[in-house]
């Protein structure tokens, strides 16, 4: 195993890392949606995350765009991702200076389904497609304690958005 495949060598991503990566994805014309912890943070949650979760269009052309975009990272670990990996594996972990988890589906939801109601969020100088709160709830349907906390936050956010005072 190559050292760059070991996520213990990566550091926790910071907001500036996310912005830089999303800017590069946008410049490459990659089709992606931010999910996971950073999506919750983009919606106002206060939480820690140790990786960047991206739901991507798993077509070979788009995988090539994502790999090109992620080549800005120090170790270019994304170069090891094969065109079919996203379709063949639940999660493809790119352990570079930060860890990025690439998925073609999240809890049964495809990129196309999630992108349909994604919200565009301005994060720094990058316009980022972020999974909607309703979609994020569907991706948090697990038994992990953090997912229960995230679901409660998202349900409250949806209620606040539907409130007349919102």
What are these regions (language model features)?
Residues 1-166:
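Compositionally biased terminal segments of proteins
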């Amino acid at each position: 195993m190559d050292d760059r495949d070991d996520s213990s060598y990566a550091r926790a991503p910071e907001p500036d890392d996310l912005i830089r990566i999303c800017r590069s994805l946008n410049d490459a014309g990659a089709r992606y949606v931010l999910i996971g912890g950073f999506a919750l943070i983009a919606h106002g949650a206060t939480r820690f995350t140790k990786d960047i979760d991206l739901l991507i269009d798993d077509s070979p052309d788009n995988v090539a765009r994502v790999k090109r975009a992620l080549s800005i990272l120090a170790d270019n670990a994304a170069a090891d991702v094969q065109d079919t990996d996203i379709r063949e594996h639940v999660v493809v972990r790119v352990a570079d200076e930060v860890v990025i988890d690439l998925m073609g589906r999240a809890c049964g939801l495809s990129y196309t389904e999630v992108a349909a109601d994604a919200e565009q969020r301005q994060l720094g100088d990058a316009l980022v497609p972020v999974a909607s709160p309703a979609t994020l709830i569907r991706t948090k349907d697990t038994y992990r304690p953090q997912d229960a906390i995230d679901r409660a936050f998202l349900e409250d956010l949806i209620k606040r958005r539907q409130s007349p005072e919102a």
